Amino acid sequence: MEHKRKKQWILIIVLLLTVCSVLAVYAGREWMFTNPFKPYTFSAVSYASGDGDGCTYVIDDSNRKILKISADGRLLWQTCASDKSFLSAERVVADGDGNVYLHDVRIEQGVQIASEGIVKLSSKGKYISTVASVEAEKGSVRRNIVGMVPTEHGVIYMQKEKEGILVSNTEQGSSKAFSVADAQDRILCCAYDRDSDSLFYVTYDGKIYKYTDSGQDELLYDSDTVDGSIPQEISYSDGVLYSADIGLRDIIRLSLIHI
């Protein structure tokens, strides 16, 4: 009887240890897939964005390495073009599910663009699929995909066409065309507010516009009035339009609440 009772206690202890181990693994599951001592380096940042958890996604200046960094500065993962997930990443955003979307560009003969696409990665940086693909005109050096906006379960991306800008929503499987004159030659990049269905764009000559149905788009910013200003990437959030000014090394902030 005593031997049997002792055996029961051993089984109970083993079960308790097993349960504790499982709980510890579950509680520290993110840590288990993270090496907090692993260094990460990049010479310069080509593009960066954040998510709702405070994580930062960085594309280095080679456009061939992407890093996910936690809010407290830990490297969660990194993926490289050599892993065959992408070719040359130019933009990165993360949706509400943690999936990551890259604006991927295939370049030939130094600067000529052969094709572009939107590549979807998992929350761990692993390739899932290519959700969009755009063939470029022969000899083209200008991008056709000109912006991305994350949604809860997907991404909205903006693409230049002959008649204007096509805004596509992968979550809803829908698209909408905005008629913008000479979009192929004029537009550098775009931002989109899905709540108000508003499109904003930066032109190659340094102007920022808001699209209007009238055909006369509203001028919001003119770099000719600010010495040295060169607006580039733009994004929209809560009534404010932001643009990275690579000439002044500053952020242009345009409040649109009154517009």
Language-model segments: residues:
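Short, solvent-exposed loop/turn segments at conserved positions within beta-propeller repeat blades
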Residues: 61-62, 109-114, 160-162, 246-247
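Residue-level detector of Asp-centered blade-edge/turn motifs that repeat once per structural unit
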Residues: 50-53, 94-97, 150-153, 193-196, ...
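Conserved small/polar residues in nucleotide/adenosyl-binding loops
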Residues: 257-259
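Beta-strand-rich domains and repeat architectures in extracellular enzymes and scaffolds
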Residues: 37-64
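Repeated scaffold domains used in trafficking and secretory/extracellular systems
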Residues: 44-47, 87-92, 142-148, 184-192, ...
